């Protein structure tokens, strides 16, 4: 059964501006520790952040809370399997919170074009 759906669209230029204005501090506020190494190697840091932000915002919408404790951006890591399929890894606190609300599986799709990144998230129970 579907227990939550969320989608988000992020403009890459917005993240270019954020990086120009605030530097690496933006990444440290948005990314989980596991994502920071991948960000450091990213060929296009603004696009990397835009994709992660869209996925995390869509996650927060599927959770039905928006971004507020325990659904915080650094508590959500966007990972991928060996074929590149995106997935989520959550902090222990967030994982327990989701489990208590009946979320058993999470699905995420991320797409990007030159100017925008889009993410769609489904929570199953």
From Swiss-Prot:
Keywords: Cytoplasm, Fatty acid biosynthesis, Fatty acid metabolism, Lipid biosynthesis, Lipid metabolism, Magnesium, Metal-binding, Transferase. Pfam families: ACPS. GO terms for molecular function: holo-[acyl-carrier-protein] synthase activity; magnesium ion binding. The keyword Metal-binding applies. This is Holo-[acyl-carrier-protein] synthase. It is found in: Cytoplasm. GO terms for cellular component: cytoplasm. HAMAP family: AcpS. One of its GO terms (biological process) is fatty acid biosynthetic process. It comes from the Bacteria. InterPro entries: 4-PPantetheinyl_Trfase_dom, 4-PPantetheinyl_Trfase_dom_sf, ACPS, Ppantetheine-prot_Trfase_dom. Transfers the 4'-phosphopantetheine moiety from coenzyme A to a Ser of acyl-carrier-protein. Its EC number is 2.7.8.7. Coiled coil: none annotated. Mg(2+) binds at residues 8, 57. It catalyses: apo-[ACP] + CoA = holo-[ACP] + adenosine 3',5'-bisphosphate + H(+). SUPFAM superfamilies: 4'-phosphopantetheinyl transferase. It comes from Laribacter hongkongensis (strain HLHK9). Belongs to the P-Pant transferase superfamily. AcpS family. Its main location: cytoplasm.
């Amino acid at each position: 059964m579907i227990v939550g759906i969320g989608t988000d669209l992020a403009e890459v230029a917005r993240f270019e501006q954020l990086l120009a204005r605030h530097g690496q501090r933006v990444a440290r506020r948005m990314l989980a520790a596991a994502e920071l190494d991948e960000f450091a190697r990213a060929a296009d840091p603004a696009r990397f952040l835009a994709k992660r932000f869209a996925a995390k915002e869509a996650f927060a919408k599927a959770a039905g809370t928006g971004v507020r404790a325990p659904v915080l951006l650094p508590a959500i890591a966007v990972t991928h399997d060996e074929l590149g399929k995106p997935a989520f890894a959550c902090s222990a606190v967030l994982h327990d919170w989701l489990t208590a609300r009946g979320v058993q599986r999470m699905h995420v799709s991320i797409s990007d074009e030159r100017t925008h990144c889009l993410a769609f998230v489904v929570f199953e129970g």
